């Protein structure tokens, strides 16, 4: 896999659309969106997921389900240690189905099945 941060892309910035999650604001935001905010760093240091009451997890870019991903592992990882910890955290949550940012939804069992593949992941510095 390729990764290691150091983005070289021009940022797209819409500050008027920001939702800033802090210890003070998190509970209110979770109430408004009716989901629990789960920190899932690794893909990026500020990656999050949303766990809904109907046992659905929106995991953002913490997992994928489609080309070019293999085994539901995202193709860009900034911090492999954090990424592995986030997968472990996801497997310990109470949900039935995962909705990734890229690809079709899949089951918690599939996430658990491919967790062992993370041990073989190596990052290569770009540039």
What are the residue ranges of the model-derived segments?
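Short coil/loop residues immediately preceding or within conserved phosphate-binding loops
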Residues: 23, 32-35
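Metallo-beta-lactamase
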Residues: 11, 34-110, 117, 121-122
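Active-site HxH/HxHxD metal-binding segment of metal-dependent hydrolases
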Residues: 1-27, 118-123
